[in-house]
Amino acid sequence: MPLMGSIYVGTSGLQTSNNALNTAAHNLSNIETAGYTRQQILQGSKFYNTIGIASVSNMQVGIGVDYTKCRQVRDEFLDASYRKENGRSSFYEICSESTQEIETLLGEMEGASFKESLAKLWTSVQELQKDPSSSITQGVFIATCSQFLERASAVSKGLNDYQQNLNSRVTGMVEDINTITDQIFELNNKIQKAEIGIEEANDYRDKRNYLIDQLSSKISIKTVENANGGVEIYAEGSPLLIGDTVTHLEVVANEDGFYDVTWGALYDFQPVYNFHQTVSSDFDTDTGELKSLLFARGDHVANYSDLENYNFYNYGTPDTNDIPIASSIVMNAQGQFDRLIHNMVTAINNVICDNADNSSKTGSYEVFTRLGSARYDAAGDYIKEDISKSPADVSTMYTISNLKINPDLLKQPTLNSFIKDDKSVDFEKATKLMEVFAGIGQVRDLNQPSEVYVDAAWTINPNLNSKHGYIAFYDSVVGQMANVGSVYNSIVSSQNATVSSLENSRQQVLGVSSEEELQNIIKFQNAYNASSRYINVIDQMLEHIITTL
């Protein structure tokens, strides 16, 4: 090779080594940058000049080294696995958070547990049974009933407020998903423009990958990179970002004021989720924070009527996309708690008013009255509860939101005197009241067309067979929530370990190691020095030839 050509070989070594040094320094400077991916230099030979042809091969001379590519070091399999498990972890974190919040509401309200109000009511019933005709025991009983209803209303309000909090978080989550999708779309355009030539838009790609990681925690996604370098995103099996088309999620309020998440007008407001699907890791249907928020929240304020039918409780209404009560943490708690209150107040009312004469069939004698309906109609007949219109119309139902203490009894607690027509004390009714409270015996169900008596003990939901009295009923509700919460906590711990393991595996591939980059700097610096010395030697040879000649 001519000496002048050899200078170009040395120059290419200088340039390539300098670029490699810059890349290693760039890696080191971003070692703490969130989402940064290690960049790696690929070097190769420049093209060869053919200077002759020998009998066995071409006679070629190389012209140096070439800076082939600056690539990101990533593992697509680890990325996909991390994003799926990250979404699953977010799903169960919401479940765990919801159960903890409900445990707090059920177990503790303003420093006093709801169970304490149950115990006080039980004590007042026992004292009433000892001396039913006493104005003192009757007054204490009514006062305790009033305190009990206040505490029950406070717990119910807490559940409803938390449900509304989840509802507002749904809108925020949808906005976040749309914002992230728009940002990814913008980065797609920047990457495609930057990579039209031979450039590598690695920093843009880092930002995009970081956003995709964030998006994966909010909604189940799958990504595909097209030939132009843009990323296509499918959310819940439907296109979210394809080419120049970005599909925004939209929230639409249902008749109960809760937000449904849809694909917007472009897809006729079709729902994003099928809530009648089984939520399971086997089907990959337990992924994404948004989905978990919707399931935990439910689609309406539940009450005891939602627990009357096994199929509706577990599977929802056929040919609709409503959320089954059993699948919703908040609605399940609302329904079970309201069932406890409903069964208690109707049993107390029915025991006290069961044998009432016509003069008392005005509702004045029942302890718990309905806000939207009297106990009896003008003919003196009991106004039955109509649950078919729930939750839109609960005016005839003995549900927490439609209850108050009989104002006449608050003024004069002795209206129910527990005195028979023969002027004797009605110990039988007081004893019956105590037995019913303890879950013993039967109580009349006035909603039936004929005189029907049902057990004074109830199951907490249609999936369980064991029956409980009121205090045991409440303990079962709290215990069930604690068990569910424990399961979710275990899943969250397991998922966090899985996500952490996958992230560690990813970092071993894409993460920046300061020791490795320092070794690269030393290596490329030595290569730079070698190229420099090579040029110096060629320079000295040229100088010697020129001066000698």
Where are these regions (language model features)?
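Structural signature of extracellular appendage/secretion-system components
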Residues: 1-549
